[in-house]
């Protein structure tokens, strides 16, 4: 059975002080677990409070815990407690073993006596307790003498950690003029010590800096305003230092501090005020509408939305001539021109401008009216202005038959300045390119310069200029619109050529054609035309004219029995007159053709030649004749085609020396080069086609391209001869050093890809700075050997082909 040796340990601490000995007796116990219940023992309490009266109390020992103070700083190991077994006779036969958390590292045990010591500094904030196991063994045999027991060593807290503000420093805002006690912010400090033991973790708050403006609640850490009517405009920023002290703020407690930066936010507690009660401004009388005259400014000590201004003109004789707008960026009032100014009419204006806050707070209205006024004097300065027309627009109506030089309007302008300079008038020629009008330079009389024609130009829009004599740069202008009135100066006429048809079997009174007329004039009451036969045809026996009284007329026959063989065409002159003053008329001719018609009245033929054929020739006979002619034409074409495809003899006679050019026109060719071909007849010379004949050197500089013969070989022997001849000519051309290369495109039976040699015109001069390599010329054969020697990099001989 395990027993404790804690009583002797408590007595050994008597030298440390009576109170510590009492604390050790009451709170520090060491117990060991046992398989049997542990009896209650009586422990005499040596001290109780300050009365030091002796008392006796019963207490039940809890044998499974040890208590040890943290942060021990002595040089010797800290004694924790003692383990003892009832089977230990003190002869050293029992061996005590300690295992578990921190065994051998933090805690050690004397295996003979069972004394437990702490060999490292203990920190409760790092680890609050350790769980270990104890066992008693027979030293000689190693056999367990007691069952293994578990116990706990708890680390007793001491005040070794100061309070800390984990969220500091703090930033807070509170409105200015806030009542006393307004909450600003709450600060919180934490203490790492054990809050369940003593006062080590009990924190008390106090303010070290910031009085008398702010206070702090000692328990909650809430900061509040302590002074009324704190004005942001007087002081905006405050730095408050808060202290948190443990041990309930008692002497010896640890403390920590933090800084709280408090800003007073703005409220609208300051009315706007104009620092300048009178403004003097000036503006030119020629200033355009909305141009700026000047600026006024009302100062407001507030900021942001509380400093926004609104400017208005509340009084003055210039309220209708000027306007004021608020610049929201700079909170100034901008005075602008509202209507045109005139120095001659009014030389000065007075305005009363008010500046006010649009956003008000009711609780600060007692601080005074949140508006202010100022007076603005504006002087209008004289400028040299251009002449002004009265009225500002002219509309003139003039008949088109007005004579040249007639005055149609008097244009008037005057100088608005006090000097009243003389004025010269003119017409902007860009507005009157036809030069139909001119204006008197002095009087401004507008007159016609050319005949007017309403049918050509019915409206004229011109611009008349007025210029000061003393200052030609001052020019005024006015628009003049001239409407040309119509007079009856155009006769009516047919709108188109009329051609009518009449059947041979037409009856008297039959309608042939309805005609109408047009007139370029435009009378007020509209057009009205009158139709009749011309005087020279008044007694026409064939046709008559009936006026429909709606600007149209009908052409009717007077008789029947028209014959195409007798007269196939009639020309009927018709007189057309208008209703204008004076009356104008013209004569139009109606062409009437006589046609043969069937019984239904449909026109069959209007050509008189058909009646010249014999009467016995019917329509079927005529068709037969045309068919025979067509067959004969087909036979002729077949014969010509067969003759063109007739076979020619294989051998060309020596006497025949006919050459033809094969020209193809169904593809896109090369122009005149398409007419060039080869004379294949020359290839039939057997003397030059001999196999052993030496090639001749060409002496000409330009090869002649002859025409291609229309005879082609058709036997194998002939083909062999031609092939040999072509090879010989090819070899001769390749070996001829004097034959120049030709860069040309020949179109034969197809559209080719061009010359593989490229264009020699693209070769650059050897004296140029080009770094192009011309070594490829050596691969083009003997004809380009000279170029390869001149332009190639290699000096050696070109390869032979």
From Swiss-Prot:
InterPro entries (alphabetical): Cadherin, Cadherin-like_dom, Cadherin-like_sf, Cadherin_CS, Cadherin_Y-type_LIR, Catenin-bd_sf
CDD domains associated with the record: Cadherin_repeat
Residue ranges annotated for the Cadherin domain, each copy included: 61-165, 166-274, 275-389, 390-494, 494-610
Any one of the GO CC terms: plasma membrane
Keywords: Calcium, Cell adhesion, Cell membrane, Cleavage on pair of basic residues, Glycoprotein, Membrane, Metal-binding, Repeat, Signal, Transmembrane, Transmembrane helix
Localisation per UniProt entry: Cell membrane
Gene Ontology molecular function, alphabetical: calcium ion binding
Domain-level remarks: Three calcium ions are usually bound at the interface of each cadherin domain and rigidify the connections, imparting a strong curvature to the full-length ectodomain.
Protein name: Cadherin-20
Taxonomic classification: Eukaryota, Metazoa, Chordata, Craniata, Vertebrata
Gene name of the record: Cdh20
């Amino acid at each position: 059975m395990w027993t404790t040796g804690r009583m002797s340990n408590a007595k050994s601490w008597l030298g440390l002080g009576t109170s510590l000995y009492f604390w050790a007796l009451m709170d520090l116990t060491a117990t060991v677990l046992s398989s049997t219940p542990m009896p209650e023992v009586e422990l005499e309490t040596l001290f109780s409070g300050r009365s030091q009266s002796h008392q006796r109390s019963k207490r039940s020992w809890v044998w499974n815990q040890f208590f040890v103070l943290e942060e021990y700083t002595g040089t010797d190991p800290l004694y924790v407690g003692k383990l003892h077994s009832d089977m230990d006779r003190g002869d050293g036969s029992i061996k005590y073993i300690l295992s578990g958390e921190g065994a051998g590292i933090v805690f050690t045990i004397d295996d003979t006596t069972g004394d437990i010591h702490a060999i490292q500094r203990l920190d409760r904030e790092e680890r609050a307790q350790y769980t270990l196991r104890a066992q008693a063994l027979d030293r000689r045999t190693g056999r367990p003498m007691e069952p293994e027991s578990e116990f706990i060593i708890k680390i007793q807290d001491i005040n070794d950690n100061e309070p800390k503000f984990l969220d500091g420093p703090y930033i807070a805002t509170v409105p200015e003029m806030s009542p006393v006690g307004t909450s600003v912010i709450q600060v919180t400090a934490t203490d790492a010590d054990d809050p369940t033991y003593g006062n080590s973790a009990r924190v008390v708050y106090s303010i070290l800096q910031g009085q008398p403006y702010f206070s702090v609640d000692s328990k909650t850490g809430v900061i509040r305003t302590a002074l009324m009517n704190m004005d942001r405009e007087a002081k905006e920023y405050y730095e408050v230092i808060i202290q948190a002290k443990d041990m309930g703020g008692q002497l010896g407690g640890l403390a920590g501090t933090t800084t709280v930066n408090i800003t007073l936010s703005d409220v609208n507690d300051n009315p706007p005020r104009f620092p300048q009660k009178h403004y003097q401004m000036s503006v030119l009388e020629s200033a355009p509408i909305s141009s700026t005259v000047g600026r006024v400014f009302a100062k407001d000590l507030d900021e942001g939305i509380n400093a926004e201004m609104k400017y208005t003109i509340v009084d003055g004789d210039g309220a209708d001539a000027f306007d004021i707008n608020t610049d929201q960026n700079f909170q100034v009032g901008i005075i602008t021109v509202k209507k045109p100014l005139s120095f001659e009419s009014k030389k000065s204006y007075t305005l009363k401008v008010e500046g006010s806050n649009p956003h008000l707070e009711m609780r600060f209205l007692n601080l005074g009216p949140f508006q202010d006024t100022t007076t603005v004097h504006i002087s209008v300065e004289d400028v040299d202005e251009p002449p002004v027309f009265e009225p500002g627009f002219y509309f003139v109506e003039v008949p088109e038959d007005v004579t040249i030089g007639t005055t149609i309007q008097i244009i008037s302008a005057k100088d608005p300045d006090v000097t009243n300079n003389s004025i010269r008038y003119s017409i902007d020629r860009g507005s009157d390119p036809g030069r139909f009008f001119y204006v008197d330079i002095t009087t401004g009389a507008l007159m016609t310069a050319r005949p007017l024609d309403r049918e050509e130009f019915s409206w004229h829009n011109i611009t008349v200029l007025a210029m000061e004599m003393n200052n030609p740069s001052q020019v005024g202008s006015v628009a003049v619109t001239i409407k040309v009135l119509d007079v009856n100066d155009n006769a009516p006429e047919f709108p188109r050529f009329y051609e009518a048809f009449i059947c041979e079997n037409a009856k008297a009174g039959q309608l042939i054609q309805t005609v109408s007329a047009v007139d370029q004039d435009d009378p007020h009451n509209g057009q009205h035309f009158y139709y009749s036969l011309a005087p020279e045809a008044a007694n026409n026996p064939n046709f008559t004219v009936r006026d429909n009284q709606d600007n149209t007329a009908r052409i009717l026959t007077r008789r029947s029995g028209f014959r195409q063989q007798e007269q196939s065409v009639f020309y009927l002159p018709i007189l057309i007159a208008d209703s204008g003053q004076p009356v104008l008329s013209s004569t139009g001719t109606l062409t009437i053709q006589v046609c043969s018609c069937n019984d239904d009245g449909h026109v069959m033929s209007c050509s008189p030649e058909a009646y010249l054929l014999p009467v016995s020739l019917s329509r079927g006979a005529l068709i037969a004749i045309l068919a025979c002619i067509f067959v004969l034409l087909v036979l002729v074409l077949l014969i010509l085609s067969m003759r063109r495809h007739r076979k020619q003899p294989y051998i060309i006679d020596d006497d025949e020396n006919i050459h033809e050019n094969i020209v193809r026109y169904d593809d896109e060719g090369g122009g005149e080069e398409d007419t060039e071909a080869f004379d294949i007849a020359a290839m039939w010379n057997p003397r030059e086609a001999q196999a052993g004949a030496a090639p001749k050197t060409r002496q000409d500089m330009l090869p002649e391209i002859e025409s291609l013969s229309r005879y082609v070989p058709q036997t194998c022997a002939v083909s062999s001869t031609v092939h040999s001849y072509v090879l010989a000519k090819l070899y001769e051309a390749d070996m001829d050093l004097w034959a120049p290369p030709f860069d040309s495109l020949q179109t034969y039976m197809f559209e080719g890809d061009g010359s593989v040699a490229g264009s020699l015109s693209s070769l650059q001069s050897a004296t140029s700075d080009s770094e192009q390599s011309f070594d490829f010329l050596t691969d083009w054969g003997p004809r380009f050997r000279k170029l390869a020697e001149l332009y190639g990099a290699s000096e050696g001989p070109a390869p032979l082909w």
